[in-house]
A protein has these predicted regions:
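N-terminal anchoring/stem segment of glycosyltransferases
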Residues: 1-64
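Conserved glycosyltransferase catalytic-site signature
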Residues: 69-76, 170-175
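Short beta-strand-to-loop element that shapes/binds the nucleotide-sugar donor at the catalytic cleft/hinge
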Residues: 112-136
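GT-A fold catalytic core of metal-dependent nucleotide-sugar glycosyltransferases
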Residues: 74-118
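Conserved nucleotide-sugar donor-binding
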Residues: 84-85, 129-144
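Short beta-alpha junction loops
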Residues: 40-45, 95, 121-122
Length: 203
């Protein structure tokens, strides 16, 4: 498998959307052959980010659902829409990559029909959103073909979500992810931090 698209999402919260320039530059330097897709939960691209418009996909906010929730959960469903038939890697808006080999080497010999979870730290009840990769058709196989809005409304109706980092419902995306992943009967690979030599610097 190869990394074909790097996908993340954000709403208009400056705590996250202000990472757009750094995110694009960092990934373009590390994996220049990959496409970058930033799903922006908004009606229009702010002027400050128009230089990066080629990498931004607008998703109009769905009324009645917190935009932070939409930005978190859309990373599970939007990969189905990617046209490029290579791996779609999802990540956080405020996570900047530092080592190319961490992303490319562990998946080099993994078949394209496999869903790969890079980190085993949250299992079994959750799956960390950083990092996971699969081909678009595999994403669809795991998360179904129902519309993004239908999925959002169903999930949102079943949780209490306050939009605060670490607050009520904040891990909904990771909990739902784990539920779908465990129920899926296709080939899976869960990587080990000790083998991939995972390391991060926190801001």
């Amino acid at each position: 498998m190869k990394v074909g698209t790097i996908l993340t999402a954000t709403d208009s919260n400056p705590l996250y959307c202000e990472f757009i320039p750094s995110f694009v530059k960092a990934w373009k330097k590390l994996i220049p052959e990959a496409d970058i897709c930033i799903v922006l939960i908004a009606h229009e691209i702010p002027d400050a980010y128009k230089p990066y418009a080629d990498h931004i996909r607008l998703f109009p906010p769905i009324e009645g659902i917190h935009t932070a929730f939409q930005a978190q959960c859309i990373r599970l469903f939007y990969p189905r829409q990617i046209a490029r038939d290579e791996g779609v890697l999802i990540t956080d808006m405020d996570m900047l990559p530092m080592r190319r080999s961490y992303y490319t080497d562990p998946i080099a010999n993994i078949p394209n029909d496999t869903f790969v979870v890079y980190r085993d730290v949250c299992l079994p009840s959750e799956i960390a959103m950083c990092y996971n990769i699969a081909h678009p058709r595999v994403w669809e196989s795991v998360f179904g073909s129902a519309s993004i809005e239908d999925n959002f409304r169903k999930i949102y109706s079943e949780v209490s979500y306050d939009g605060q980092h670490g607050g009520s419902g904040w891990a909904t995306d990771q909990i739902f992810f784990a539920k779908q992943f465990h129920a899926w009967a296709g080939p899976k690979a869960v990587l080990d931090d000790r083998v991939t030599r995972f390391c991060r610097l926190d801001r």
